[in-house]
Amino acid sequence: MTNTILRLPVVLTERGRSRSSHYQDIKEGLFTHPVQIGLRAVGWPANEVMEINSARIAGKSEAEIRVLVKKLEADRKAA
């Protein structure tokens, strides 16, 4: 597995969401928080974007996606 970090424009394209919808999803626990990659730069681990997209494609409920998001963020801290 690679540790690629995707910047916002790529994440929005991958998700098919607008910027405001993306940040609303983060606020509602439906997407992971970004990681700091510079003083004024953030990004998202590619594997997290892929896992959340796969869950949506599989028809997972919002509650199931919230559980996945919590797991992904906990895994970050454990790494």
Locate predicted features.
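Polyanion-binding surface elements
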Residues: 1-28, 51-58
